[in-house]
């Protein structure tokens, strides 16, 4: 399962509830992008969330 190396975001599981409160398992997936960034001074392809990219927490190479 892919995981954001900056924020640690990953797939979350829970229940979808109908009006009658029936439950069905479902998952919420983060918007992960595979990008090249500098990790320890070297370029590396890693999974980063779109939120981390937009907020400027990480810089593309």
Swiss-Prot record:
GO cellular component terms attached to this protein's record: ribonucleoprotein complex; ribosome
Gene Ontology terms, MF aspect: structural constituent of ribosome
Keyword terms: Ribonucleoprotein, Ribosomal protein
Database matches in Gene3D superfamilies: Ribosomal protein L28/L24 (2.30.170.40)
GO BP term, pick one: translation
Bridged cysteine pairs (disulfide): none
NCBIfam families: L28 (TIGR00009)
Record protein name field: Large ribosomal subunit protein bL28
Lineage of the species this protein comes from: Bacteria, Bacillati, Bacillota, Bacilli, Lactobacillales
Protein encoded by which gene: rpmB
């Amino acid at each position: 399962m892919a995981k954001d190396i900056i924020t640690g975001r990953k797939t979350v599981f829970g229940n979808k509830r109908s009006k009658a409160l029936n439950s069905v398992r479902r998952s919420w997936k983060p918007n992960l992008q595979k990008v090249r960034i500098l990790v320890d001074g070297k370029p590396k392809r890693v999974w980063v969330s779109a939120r981390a990219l937009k907020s400027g927490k990480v810089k593309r190479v």
